[in-house]
Amino acid sequence: MNSIPDSYSLKQGFPEGLGEYVDPSGNPNSQVRIGYGQDSVSRFQQPVPDVDPTAVNHYNASAPIEVASPFDNVTQGLVGSDAQALAEYWQKTIDTLEHDDQAVKTLHLPLARIKKVMKTDDDVKNKMISAEAPFLFAKGSEIFIAELTMRAWLHAKKNQRRTLQRSDIANAVSKSEMYDFLIDIISKDNNNSRASSSQAHMSATQVAAMGGMNGLQPFPTQAGLPNQGFPMPTGSQLPFSNQQSSQPSMQYSSHPSRMQQMQDIDQSMYKQQRLGSEYPQLQMSDNSGNVNQMNMQRPVMVAPYMAEHLYRYPPTHLESGSSAFRLQSSPMGYQMPQFQGNMRPNMQQSQMFDPSAYGMSRRPGSPRQFDQQQRLYSQPNAMMYQTQQGRQGNPMHQQFSQQQNPLSRYSQQPQ
């Protein structure tokens, strides 16, 4: 009972047309054989043509699949000689890493700082860092910096420049997908630089407008440097406003008692420089040939922190004339009148020479005038070459020779 006879078939008791599906729409071409009978199966069997299997292959029929290499994106965004140069750089770098011994001392980046950067990650903060990890991180950072610099240098070379600029780095970042994480940083820096440059330009225009209203011209700056907005006067205007010039501004000379106001000084002593921020300099004409101008009072520029000190402690021991600037040793007899030169034999050796800065005239009167040659080189007095006979014939010498020294023992003799 469990056996099934061989004569049993699924077609037994079923009509002949069971395997045919007729479309209810009446289209005779839409009949499909489902394949219950032998006739339906034989209809779908078609003869296989005789084709060489080596000529037709399913790999050749489909498009070739390119296997991506880890170095395919090295030359991304570059063509021609630039791509070839970058490919050669990477090949040389790989050969160096594979064959040369990598020493820790040859690294250009500090390992301690790299460890701190690695510790900022939340996954590594509470874990130990191996000794090789900072080394590999530093080596990869060096290669990354070198490649980015090389791409920026190729862009600067096209523009015939020898220095890298911010635009070169931005161009190198925009050409490769590997540097997408730097786009936000570069764009932020560019926005900050543009804002600062526009603000400096606005301040310069405002200062120029204010200077035009006040009759002042802005100080010219060098190319590439922002104008700080300090207007400088022209050569025909005073460096201070009228309100400041009305105040008593003192000008110290060699002695603080000889103070002069700023209005008394000639305006030609100030000059405006074309380039550079220099202080107004004092134009002192060299009139060394004119003897009358040697001992005239010249204003001396004193530093602000020394003005109060000089006012409280005046240097009264210095001579206010031209000899205050010339410290040379000369005989005192050269600065004396002619009749005092005859007393040179009675003077001691320590009193013969005295610095001219401290050598004041013993008798009131104007100091002796010197010509240009005598100011530079001390000239001997002609009185030194007079003979004793000539001195005896001098009436001045006879006048002093008859006088006795009050401290001498012979001065107490009765007349």
UniProtKB/Swiss-Prot annotation:
Residues 354-415 are annotated as: Disordered. GO terms for molecular function: DNA binding; DNA-binding transcription factor activity, RNA polymerase II-specific; protein heterodimerization activity. The keyword Transcription regulation applies. Gene3D superfamilies: Histone, subunit A. Keywords: Activator, DNA-binding, Nucleus, Transcription, Transcription regulation. InterPro entries: Histone-fold, Histone_H2A/H2B/H3, Transcr_DNA_Rep_Reg. Residues 369-415 have a biased composition (Polar residues). It comes from the Eukaryota. One of its GO terms (cellular component) is CCAAT-binding factor complex. The keyword Lipid biosynthesis does not apply. Component of the CCAAT-bound heteromer, php5 is essential for DNA-binding activity. It is essential for transcription activation of cyc1. It is the linchpin that binds to the subunit association domains (SAD) of php2 and php3 to bring these proteins together. Two complexes bind CCAAT; complex I, that consists of php2/3/5 and complex II, that consists of php2/3/5/4. Belongs to the NFYC/HAP5 subunit family. This is Transcriptional activator hap5.
